Amino acid sequence: MDYSKTEETPINEEQGSTNSSESRSNEELFSDCDQQHSSIANEFGLTELPKDDKVYELIYRHCQSKLTSHLSNQFEIVSILKNGFQTPLGQAKLKAFQIYAESVAKKSGSCCGNKAAVAEAARVKYGCCGVEKEELKAILMYGFSNNALCLSPDNAPLQCMIDPSSSCNEDGISFLLFSRIIMGKSEVVCSTSQSYPSSMEFDSGVDSLTSPNKYIIWSTHMNTHVLPEFVVCIKTPSILKRKNPKSPWISFPVLINSISKFLNQSQIRLIHKHYKEHQDRRISRCELIQRLRSITGDSLLVQIIKSVGQKVHKDT
């Protein structure tokens, strides 16, 4: 789905949609946060989209339907920020992305035409990942820095919201980063240790060629083939409704312990190894999540998070 288009684009029924009246009913609830969101936008050098903006409405309907359909309204979208690439560095990043898209399109054997033709030939798609505030700031300023970048297709933002409370800032805001990605020719990636394409033939990795749940962009490509474009700011109702929030969340030790019941010994050892690396600050939280997803698969991970989260909620 191309969010950069401003025309009224209907959401595929299979992907889900939400009633616009829902956003209206939440308007009063979030009105006191407007100044805070503008502050975040200014801090990141982004522009906050007005709620009547067509791009805002498209992203809101699409993203809200995915979050609510899986997590029973545990998440609320409170603002959407856009990267306008207004600075000289931003302009350079945008131009570089366009040049690489044309290059990948030519490599596929397609003749470059207009932007739409280039995007189709280079298989430019949208992907998303959950990020912490400081990670987001670093990405927008300096780019991505992990060994590989694992993103979810834009029709499955739930996959990015693992361990949500640990990714919140002090105001309970989580950030979902939507980026344009040059996928080019993809290969199926099974090994968690693979950190670059198996050959020059490939531009990206996926967990499945037919129904991918993960887009994998290598460190050699992540700052040329990925363009951060939108930030969706999300807040949980439990935080909004309580003066001193104690919203249920899943810590990594609890999550790892629950997942271990379904994995073999080598997978468990690998997960504990990665968690130790995170504790020693050798890998970021974002990279730990990416490695965890690669080992367990998203389906199992989502089931565990929902199951444990419901138990924690009952206990509280």
UniProtKB/Swiss-Prot annotation:
One of its GO terms (cellular component) is nucleus. Pfam families: RST. GO terms for biological process: cellular response to hypoxia. Residues 14-23 have a biased composition (Low complexity). Coiled coil: none annotated. Residues 28-255 form the PARP catalytic domain. GO terms for molecular function: NAD+ poly-ADP-ribosyltransferase activity. Residues 1-28 are annotated as: Disordered. It is found in: Nucleus. Its main location: nucleus. Keywords: Developmental protein, Nucleus, Stress response. Residues 243-314 form the RST domain. Probable inactive ADP-ribosyltransferase that may be involved in stress and developmental responses. This is Probable inactive poly [ADP-ribose] polymerase SRO4. It comes from Arabidopsis thaliana (Mouse-ear cress). The gene is SRO4.
